[in-house]
Amino acid sequence: MGLPEVNFLRKNCILVELKLFYQTVYPPKELYWNNRITAELSTFSNIKYARPTFAVNNGTFQRTRPKLDLVLASSDIRKLATVLFNLKALIMNTKGEEPTLTTMTSVQTNEEKNDNLEQKYSSLLDRWNGKVEVHDSPFLQLQRDSNLLFAERPVRYVSTTEGEGVDISSEEFFRLEEEQCRRNYDVLVDEHSTPSVGMKDGQYGPNIIHFEPSLYHTYSSLPMSMKFWLNGLEDDETTMMNIDEKSAENLDILLHGFKGFSNKRVKG
């Protein structure tokens, strides 16, 4: 990974581990919901990398913590960080909605994504500053028809995947450090579907996926597949906001034109 890539990552990208918590022991239709989540995220950010870990490995009885490893880009990384790390949940199917695999019919322009990000950021600030009436709920729903739920109070410190806390407003937050740090790679868990405190109560009941985002803050903490992807990027004259399709296909880890994950893992 050359200097242009490093500079781009520090100025425009957030590398995040998004843990998913379902209220069922065996989460239903994980592939569908991973597609839904990335579709929601892509409305206000550019998804450069997305790789899921499913709760139940295909062909085995081994259970793991379901998550998404993501590289999200934006021209305003500070606003993206505020929106992303205050994102707490996704409302699942409403009554009558068929959980079928779908793809986005159109790809939003960067200008549209920036507008959506600005709208979410401004709405959150208005809620947190008391300019908009907040109802009695553990979450903020910025619009009635929105599936995204946010923190009732702003997050000040973000947890890294190595268990450290980083001030979301600091310059340090946006640096991908090089030093070696220890990381727990044991992802086998018994409580992968256990929601956070307060998740079981409230108006949404079990019809919700809870998010727990953690920041990848050092190169040594990155998953091997993400390292391969970063090292596979080539220096060229084009901006990294438009990553070469062939590189993505060779690595088989980027979203293919924002159409979602491969259909190889449909059972669930």
From Swiss-Prot:
Location within or outside the cell: Mitochondrion
Principal subcellular localization: mitochondrion
Biological processes, Gene Ontology terms: Group I intron splicing; mitochondrial mRNA processing
DNA repair listed as a keyword: no
This protein's UniProt keywords: Mitochondrion, mRNA processing, mRNA splicing
An annotated GO cellular component: mitochondrion
Transmembrane helix among keywords: no
Entry function: Involved in splicing of intron aI5-beta of the mitochondrial COX1 transcript.
Note: Present with 861 molecules/cell in log phase SD medium.
Family: To baculovirus occlusion-derived virus envelope protein E27 (ODV-E27).
Annotated protein name in UniProt: Protein MSS18
Species this protein is from: Saccharomyces cerevisiae (strain ATCC 204508 / S288c) (Baker's yeast)
